[in-house]
């Protein structure tokens, strides 16, 4: 029997639920539900027969491909470490040391950290500012077009949308 979640086959997770073996590896909860961890009965590390997040070939690859179709991206990746790890990975994947990157002044500190670690040349631009409430709101397409025209050699542009205050920017990707 194979479960499906959004069209993705989950045969391996079904097999894990039926497995009557005690695991002597991480994670430490040993697939037990005693700790109230949702999904612990199928939580397993990269062992033979399981997929590997860093070299996906099975369920993880299927999920990444499905995400690519949903978001109409060339490639999608699952990640760990939260958004900070994802931001670092994305910037390192696109930019080499010394490259130019354009970032909005309201970006998360992990963007600044990534730029420092990668030794990037940073060009800043300012999203619209709400003087009444005292924070940056959204970025306009005209602002993006202008900063890109002035920095055609930039490898990437980082825009926070939605912002921490919930404002969104309607920016057309020029890929």
Give the ranges of each region predicted by the language model.
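N-terminal "arm"/small-domain region of PLP-dependent enzymes with the aminotransferase-like
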Residues: 4-58
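Conserved N-terminal alpha-helix of the aminotransferase class I/II PLP-enzyme fold
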Residues: 39-85, 106
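Conserved beta-loop-alpha segment that forms the PLP phosphate-binding cup at the N-terminus of a helix
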Residues: 74-98, 114
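Short hydrophobic alpha-helical runs that function as membrane-insertion/retention elements
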Residues: 77-78, 102, 122-126
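Substrate-binding/gating loop at the entrance of the active-site cleft, primarily
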Residues: 103-122
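Short, acidic/turn-prone active-site loops that include or flank metal/cofactor-
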Residues: 106-109, 126-132
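Active-site phosphate-binding strand-loop segment of PLP-dependent enzymes
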Residues: 133-175
């Amino acid at each position: 029997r194979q479960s499906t979640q959004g069209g993705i086959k989950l045969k391996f997770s079904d097999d894990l639920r039926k497995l009557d073996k005690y695991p002597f590896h991480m994670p430490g909860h040993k697939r037990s539900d005693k700790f109230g961890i949702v999904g612990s009965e199928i939580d397993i590390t990269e062992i033979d027969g399981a997929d590997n997040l860093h070299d996906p070939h099975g369920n993880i690859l299927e999920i990444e491909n499905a995400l690519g179709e949903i978001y109409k991206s060339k490639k999608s990746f699952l990640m760990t470490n939260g958004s900070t790890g994802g931001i670092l990975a994305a910037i390192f994947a696109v930019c080499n040391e010394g490259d130019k990157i354009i970032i909005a002044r309201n970006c998360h500190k992990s963007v600044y950290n990534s730029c420092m670690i990668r030794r990037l040349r940073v060009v800043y631009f300012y999203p619209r500012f709400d003087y009444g409430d005292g924070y940056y709101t959204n970025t306009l397409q005209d602002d993006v077009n202008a900063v890109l025209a002035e920095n055609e050699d930039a490898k990437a542009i980082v825009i926070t949308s939605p912002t921490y205050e919930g404002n969104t920017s309607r920016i057309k990707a020029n890929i």
